[in-house]
UniProtKB/Swiss-Prot annotation:
NCBIfam families with a match to the protein in the record: addA_Gpos
CDD domains the UniProt entry points to: DEXQc_UvrD
Catalytically driven reaction(s): Couples ATP hydrolysis with the unwinding of duplex DNA by translocating in the 3'-5' direction; ATP + H2O = ADP + phosphate + H(+)
Gene3D superfamilies, per the entry: 3.90.320.10, P-loop containing nucleotide triphosphate hydrolases (3.40.50.300), PCRA, domain 4 (1.10.486.10)
GO CC annotation, single: cytosol
Family according to the record: Belongs to the helicase family. AddA subfamily.
Amino acids binding ATP: A47, S48, A49, G50, S51, G52, K53, T54
Keywords: ATP-binding, DNA damage, DNA repair, DNA-binding, Exonuclease, Helicase, Hydrolase, Isomerase, Nuclease, Nucleotide-binding
Name of the protein: ATP-dependent helicase/nuclease subunit A
One GO biological process term: double-strand break repair via homologous recombination
Cysteine-cysteine disulfides: none
Organism field: Streptococcus agalactiae serotype III (strain NEM316)
Record InterPro entries: AddA, DNA_helicase_UvrD-like_C, DNA_helicase_UvrD/REP, P-loop_NTPase, PDDEXK-like_dom_sf, PDDEXK_AddAB-type, Restrct_endonuc-II-like, UvrD-like_ATP-bd
GO MF entry, a single one: double-stranded DNA binding
């Protein structure tokens, strides 16, 4: 059929005009239309929050389909599995709509094929796609397609720690042992263990894995900074410029401060005060030195400049005016602290290079050995799979070309959160001019997952400067939020975000515009509010001990406003969402809301599972079974509700012997052989007797049964599962216990067997201060939502409270002894021995930790990256609100009133100030004070503690009890009648559509055969319950050596072998033997494969020879999906499967399938698989529109190989 052609720019302009002049209620914007129809070049869509990027993606894909591009010719990468599912649902809906309006049967048939193809199309996460590549082509790297993913961090840690320990031991005894010990001590200090060094190794390893080629990065970039920045001349020019800018800013801020009305310039006698003279001198020097830097100092004089500044400015950060502290000098102190010691640093920095080379060697060895261990386990992390996929595409031109020819377009959503591994994959899949990228750099908030917003930014600038490289389209209309939210968001980020902090200039092209007239309607009551708890705490932002969780008073402040909204404005609780930076330490909110009757649900994912009481009891039970000599665990078990020993009981047992382990004391008490057996009362003796018998039963049971069975035996023997079901929050407690059994079962499925190893894994989790996610249970519907800002991304809520805006940003990484840069490599704090610097050797050693220049540069880069991400995080949080936005924190109204009044730089807060501020609140107050003469569209309101009493806050009305006398409300009998009527109607529908209700949505060919066995009239689709054997050969096996072979394992191994054989015009026995070595199966299974039969197939049978002759037309392990109709209900379902192989010729297809079933008569298997082969043939007919299909079974389970042609 003939499809519509793609549109040129003139055609797109016509559509834009028509849309503008249409009477549609909601019109597409010109930019949306351009993004949907632009064709023939790379396209980058910069889509601001709420601008309809998903709508654009779906419409563009649909347009491609309507122009004849099959769905399997599109590569569509999404950020999450959930996003992929939602995209598929929207596509299905749009295709169904197009089917209804399709005018030709050909188009209907084509769209129906695309509808079926959605589920098997390449729409999903990059992780899922790279797994698909490795499954199919991993054999080129010697990787088995039957691998598993190491998703559990705890399992990864077990393997990693074992590899690390072995390698560490090798280096400690190797030829560079002395230097290696020095390297370890550089990071571990005087600690006796090497845990700190191990964490640094893991940090470098994890960072390298985010690059597209970890080994190459380690070899070429890792030492780059250390080898480059060795003297003053190597200091980057931008670092010098930045320092001079900080000096200018400090001078300007100090000058503004001295001009304030409250600043005391003169004494009572009219003479300048000492402070005023000192400050004027500082201003004069800073301006002079910054303006004449090259003349006075130059790069070689940076250390002298830093020392001169130190001698002029005060040692503290603050200047106090009228009782208010202004941290004028903080940023300048931060910048010069390392510079003034550069001469000494350069002197010792060279010593660290050899240690870094040793670290480089260690990490490379660790990476290789860790990978080999994972290969041995046939289990890999997602990053391994991604790197395998890249290696396959880079090293195999034919495979790469196959994908580049296959994809009409390579599309990616959330492009701003791509990392370099994902970017390399997209480059390899694209032909260079068919990429479609959608994202928003202002919403890049996944740097902790190694996402790099500069990937987006580089494309943005390149396409902006040179349109021939690609088309840049900016979507700035917002269809989510009211003007009150949009205006406050714009006013904040116009003055905050630029390329230095935020990574992009928030100019008019990025400002949010209301996309519909409805949003432009003004509602004064919905003006954005910054609610601050008025507190007299001094130096809130400078307190290192600041609590990161929200204070009870702040929680009360939020509760008060929510109750007001609910009562006065009839806002349902479910319309309100609280956003927090972290999912931990929010207990204060939960307790406060519970106190005032506000229903609250969290987004899940809290990491408190192992700390729940019922799980702790079970873990101590398992620890005791594993090792009864663990006194802490055993006493906890005895004290638990399972056995109910009280303190008096335990004391009587304990004094039976002073020195023994507690378990031995219990045994002494059991046998009445202790030193004070007279203290064991009959009642206590009965308890001990019961415990010992039960406990020994569990220990015996553990030797021969799975962890899963052991845990359930404990639950049932002591009724513990039922017991917790009677406690408060019973549903959650029972779910936790049930999950413990499932997690134990999952653990053993990974190949790690045994109670000891499971306990060791759990203890490692706790030792590393990690935990497992809580188990989700049913939650109330009409409740306030509490979630992290990260979790809220992509969502929208009517009322949003951003909590704890006074929380300090986490700067832990900046204080690390090791900081990594993607472009400059490693920078470290080097511990130098400066003993010989002293004139007299007063001490045996003088150790000084110094920040090397690469470390200082990386530190500044990391600080700016951290602040930029926090700024984008605030943008994401503010743009979630539809109607009204609240930001909640705490500050002192009297002491902080003028604290943030700054001098504007190019309509932005000064860079030096933005770098100094470490909370959302700092930014908001500084913008408000610095630009108070402008309309900023948000108010700052202080709330005192006196306004947060129970009387002022109020209470949510409790539900009223049922009143039987109120006839108007007592409609019970009517409800029952109506309910019975509804149930009868439902039952009638169930019977009418029983077949459709029971019909599964997706089935495999084998399942189709079984499911339709009673109703399908297909020859051979009956389930064979018995096989009549013509002869019986009864032999007694030797049970000492014989092992029953698993038919399924043998079948899987044979199929993998046939897939791995390198096909050519002449397959030899050596090729089959080589392929067999690559098969991932037990040795016994491999030995059971009769490769002589396979060799016979290729050498002697007509089909085998023909396959070799037509190898260029051969397809192996081909997945398919096909739409079928249930004959009884008329409902449609999808059949999916994998075809072993077929030859796709010009006018016919030769289909073949391997079978390892045992047989005597080949006709048995021919009849058995008639229906399955018919389904395969039908799928191929629909895919290629070829009628003639020859079907063959290759039977390997008989005495000799048989090739059977099907009817």
């Amino acid at each position: 059929m003939t499809f519509k052609p793609f549109l040129n720019p003139e055609d797109i302009a016509v559509i834009q005009t028509e849309e503008k002049n249409s009477d549609k209620k909601q019109k597409r914007t010109p930019e949306q239309i351009e993004a949907i129809y632009t064709f023939g070049n790379n396209v980058l869509v910069s889509a601001s929050a709420g601008s309809g990027k998903t709508f654009v993606m779906v419409e563009r894909i649909l347009d491609k389909l309507l122009r004849g591009v099959p769905i399997d010719s599109l590569f569509i990468s999404t950020f999450t599995v959930k996003a992929a599912g939602e995209l598929k649902e929207r596509l299905e809906k749009k295709i169904n709509e197009s089917l209804k309006s399709a005018e030709s049967d050909d188009l209907k048939q084509f769209l129906t094929q695309q509808l079926v193809g959605i589920q098997t199309a390449d729409i999903g996460t990059m992780d899922a796609f790279t797994q698909k590549i490795v499954n199919q082509y991993g054999y080129t790297l010697g990787i088995s397609p039957i691998f598993r993913i190491l998703q559990d961090k705890n399992e990864q840690d077990v393997i990693k720690n074992e590899v690390y320990a072995d390698l560490f031991s090798d280096y400690m005894t190797g030829k560079n042992a002395a230097s290696f010990i020095k390297l370890v001590k550089n990071f571990s200090g005087n600690r006796k263990d090497s845990k700190a060094f191990r964490e640094m190794v893991y940090k470098v390893y994890a960072f390298s894995q985010s690059t597209d080629n970890p080994k190459r990065w380690m070899q070429t970039v890792f030492l780059k900074g250390a080898q480059t920045y060795t003297d003053f001349e190597a200091i980057p020019d931008q670092e010098v410029s930045s320092l001079l800018n900080v000096m200018q800013t400090t001078a300007n801020q100090l000058r503004d401060l001295t001009d304030q009305e409250d600043y005391k310039q003169l004494t009572a006698k009219g003479v300048p005060t000492a402070n005023y003279k000192k400050h004027l001198k500082i201003i004069e020097n800073l301006v002079h030195w910054s303006q004449d830097f090259n003349l006075l100092y130059g790069k070689k004089g940076l250390a002298n400049l830093a020392r001169d500044i130190t001698n002029v400015i005060p040692s503290g950060n603050d200047v106090t005016v009228a009782g208010v502290k202004y941290p004028i000098f903080k940023q300048l102190h931060n910048r010069i602290v390392g510079l003034k010691h550069l001469e000494v640093i350069f002197k010792y920095q060279g010593e660290s290079l050899f240690l870094l080379e040793l670290l480089q060697s260690f990490v490379l060895d660790f990476s290789e050995q860790y990978l080999q261990e994972k290969i041995q386990e046939n289990a890999f992390e997602f990053s391994d799979i991604a790197h395998f996929a890249i290696q396959i595409l880079e090293e195999n031109h034919d495979i790469r070309q196959l994908y580049q020819d296959k994809y009409h377009e390579v599309m990616v959503d959330e492009y701003q959160d791509n990392n370099h591994t994902q970017e390399r994959m997209l480059e390899l899949l694209s032909n260079g001019h068919n990429r479609f990228m959608v994202g928003d750099i202002k919403q890049s908030i996944y740097r902790f997952r190694q996402a790099d917003p500069q990937i987006f930014n580089d494309k943005y600038k390149a396409y902006q400067d040179n349109p021939s490289q690609g088309k840049l389209i900016i979507l700035k209309e917002n269809f989510r939020s009211q003007s009150e939210v949009l205006d406050s968001t714009n006013s904040v980020f116009t003055h905050l975000m630029d390329e230095e902090v935020g990574d992009i200039l928030y100019d008019e092209s990025h400002q949010l515009k209301a996309g519909s007239p409805r949003q432009q309607e003004r509602h004064p009551n919905n003006k954005t509010q910054v609610l601050l708890l008025d507190t007299d705490e001094d130096d809130i932002n400078d307190s290192d001990s600041q609590q990161y969780d929200i204070s009870p008073a702040e929680a009360k402040l939020v509760a008060k406003e929510i109750i007001r909204l609910h009562k006065e404005e009839n806002v349902p609780f479910q319309d309100i969402t609280l956003l927090v930076s972290s999912r931990t330490r929010n207990d204060g909110i939960l307790q406060t809301f519970d106190r005032y009757g506000i229903p609250l649900v969290t987004d899940g994912g809290e990491q408190n599972y192992l700390k729940s009481v019922e799980v702790m009891v079970m873990l101590d039970t398992l620890r005791s079974i594993d090792n009864p000599l663990n006194d802490y665990a055993l006493v906890a078990l005895l004290r638990s509700p399972m056995f109910g020993f009280n303190e008096d009981d335990l004391t009587r047992i304990a004094i039976q012997d002073v020195k023994m382990a507690f378990y031995h004391k219990v045994k002494l008490s059991y046998h009445k052989e202790g030193h004070h057996s007279d203290l064991i009362t009959p009642e206590l003796s009965s308890k001990i007797d019961h415990f010992m018998k039960t406990f020994q039963t569990w220990r015996d049971f553990a030797k021969w049964h799975s962890l899963y069975d052991l845990i359930w035996k404990i639950y049932n023997d002591r009724f513990y599962y039922d017991y917790v079901g009677a406690l408060p929050k019973a549903e959650q407690r029972q779910a936790n216990l049930y999950a413990l059994a499932l997690r134990a079962n999952q653990f053993e499925k990974t190949g790690f067997k045994g109670l000891s190893r499971f306990i060791r894994m759990i203890d490692k989790v706790l030792e590393n201060e990690n935990d497992l996610a809580d188990v989700e249970v049913a939650l109330p519907q009409n409740a306030v939502n509490l979630m992290t800002i990260h979790k809220s991304k992509g969502l929208e809520f009517k009322y949003v409270f951003i909590l704890n805006i006074d929380k300090k940003f986490s700067m832990v990484d900046i204080t690390s002894p090791l900081i990594l840069s993607r472009n400059q490599g490693i920078g470290i704090k080097y511990v130098a021995d400066m003993r010989h610097e002293l004139e007299e050797e007063l001490l045996p050693a003088v150790k000084v930790s110094m920040e090397t220049l690469p470390y200082q540069l990386n530190k500044r880069e990391l600080r700016l990256a951290t602040l930029s991400e926090q700024m984008r995080l605030l943008y994401v949080a503010m743009t979630r609100a539809e109607k009204k936005l609240y930001l909640v924190g705490k500050a002192s109204q009297t002491k902080w009133a003028d604290h943030y009044d700054l001098v504007s730089e190019n309509n932005h807060l000064p860079l030096a100030s933005r770098e100094t501020f470490v909370t959302f609140q700092d930014w908001l107050l500084a913008v408000h004070e610095t630009y108070k003469k402008q309309e900023l569209f948000y108010d700052i309101n202080f709330v005192s503690l006196e306004e947060l009493t129970d009387h002022h806050i109020g209470m949510v009305n409790p539900s009223l009890p049922f009143n039987p006398d109120n006839k108007a409300e007592n409609r019970q009998s009517e409800d029952i009648v109506r309910a019975i009527s509804v149930l009868e109607s439902v039952e009638q529908i169930n019977q009418t559509y029983k077949a459709a209700i029971e019909l599964p949505t997706v089935r495999t060919p084998s399942q189709v055969k079984k499911f339709y066995e009673p109703i399908l009239d297909i020859e051979g689709v009956d389930v064979m319950e018995t096989i009549t054997k013509t002869s019986v050969d009864f032999k007694l096996p030797d049970f000492s050596t014989s092992k029953k072979q698993d038919p399924a394992a043998l079948g899987s191994a044979v199929h993998e072998l046939m897939q791995r054989i390198e096909m050519s015009s002449h397959v030899k026995m050596e090729d089959i033997q080589k392929a067999l070595t690559e098969v991932n199966a037990e040795t016994s299974v491999k030995a059971a494969i009769q490769i002589e039969k396979i060799n016979y197939f290729f050498q002697e049978t007509s089909l085998g020879k023909y396959i070799q002759e037509e190898v260029e037309h051969l397809h192996r392990e081909a997945p398919f999906a096909m739409l079928k109709e249930d004959p009884e209900s008329g409902e449609k379902f999808v059949v999916r499967g994998i075809i072993d192989g077929y030859l796709l010729l010009e006018n016919r297809i030769i289909l073949f399938d391997y079978k390892t079933d045992k047989f005597v008569n080949p006709l048995e298997l021919k009849e058995r698989y008639q229906g399955q082969m018919a389904l395969y043939a039908e799928a191929l007919k629909k895919s290629y529109e070829i009628e003639k299909i020859d079907k063959y079974l290759i039977l390997l389970g008989g005495k000799q190989l048989e090739v059977v042609k099907m009817d």
